[in-house]
């Protein structure tokens, strides 16, 4: 595989962030079709959209614990497989309650993605390259949201909304198979990493460890960081950003169809 395994892993993470948002936005884009087939109204869809975040929020924490215990490779692969399954099962939903349950399960399965990705970056990259890697993989999220409209819209119009979800399911499963074939928690556990790449990563990490020892950095508890104003302000800003983002991701496609007769 050459001497750039770590960047291949980043590419896979970039793709899974794209798939993550493609799967997440698919329901919003197909709402006008589903409303007619399942006789659902805006109030019910509001609860369905919101139910995703209850599962997602809880399993952000649980997913982080699982990543520390079982490793990022396993947790990420299983998470993608499960969320793809629950996304695909949307195709067989029969009404409000089945859609609600599937959306909660979908959110739970997506919860570990950020913890898994960050753990992989920490395992494969020294700090001097970590921000570049995170920036690249994070670009997958907005790009996934951008391509979701034309892709899901085309699939839904060409084959129907139920087959569209099955095709999206297949995309996630293909990614999962490739992930388990290529990824490992760290360079020293990868069967195909070159000695050149392994030595380079270890050398840079050793230099950083030596520098941290010289600086004698003090470790703090989680409570210490939760009391820092910069952390609280950043968290609030992120909350506001997500509120606006997911409002538009959830409802804007329906608005365009209902008010401007766009799309379906």
What does each model-found stretch correspond to?
Residues 8-42, 248-253:
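Extracytoplasmic
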Residues 25, 53-61, 111, 145-146:
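Residue-level signature of mid-helix packing/kink "hotspots" within the transmembrane helices
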Residues 27-28, 221-264:
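Extracytoplasmic gate region of multi-pass secondary transporters
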Residues 34-35, 66-67, 151-159, 256-257:
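Interfacial helix-cap and linker-helix signal at transmembrane-aqueous boundaries
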Residues 39, 71, 92-98, 109, ...:
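Helix-breaking motifs and short loop linkers at transmembrane-helix boundaries and internal kinks
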Residues 58-97:
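Conserved MFS/SLC helix-loop-helix module at the cytosolic interface between two early adjacent transmembrane helices
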Residues 102-142:
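Cytoplasmic helix-loop-helix junction between adjacent transmembrane helices
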Residues 137-190:
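Helix-loop-helix hairpin linking two adjacent transmembrane segments in secondary transporters
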């Amino acid at each position: 595989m050459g001497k750039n395994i770590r960047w291949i892993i980043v590419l896979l993470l970039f793709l899974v962030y794209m798939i993550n948002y493609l799967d997440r936005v698919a329901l919003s884009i197909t709402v006008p079709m589903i409303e007619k087939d399942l006789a659902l109204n805006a109030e019910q869809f509001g609860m369905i959209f919101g139910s995703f975040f209850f599962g997602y929020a809880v399993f952000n924490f649980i997913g982080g614990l699982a990543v520390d215990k079982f490793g990022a490779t396993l947790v990420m692969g299983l998470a993608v497989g499960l969320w793809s399954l629950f996304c695909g099962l949307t195709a067989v939903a029969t009404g409000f309650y089945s859609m609600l349950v599937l959306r909660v399960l979908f959110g739970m399965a997506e919860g570990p993605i950020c913890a898994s990705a960050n753990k992989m970056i920490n395992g494969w990259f020294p700090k001097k390259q970590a921000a570049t890697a995170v920036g690249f993989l994070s670009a997958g999220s907005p790009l996934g949201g951008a391509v979701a409209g034309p892709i899901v819209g085309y699939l839904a119009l060409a084959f129907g909304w139920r087959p569209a979800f099955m095709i999206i399911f297949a995309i996630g499963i293909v990614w999962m198979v490739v992930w388990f074939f290529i990824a490992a928690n760290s360079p020293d556990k990868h069967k195909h990493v070159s000695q050149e790449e392994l030595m380079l990563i270890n050398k840079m990490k050793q230099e950083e460890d030596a520098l941290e020892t010289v600086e004698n950095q003090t470790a703090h508890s989680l409570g210490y960081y939760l009391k820092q104003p910069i952390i609280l302000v950043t968290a609030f800003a992120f909350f506001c950003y997500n509120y606006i983002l997911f409002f538009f991701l959830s409802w804007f496609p329906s608005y365009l169809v209902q008010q401007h007769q766009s799309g379906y």
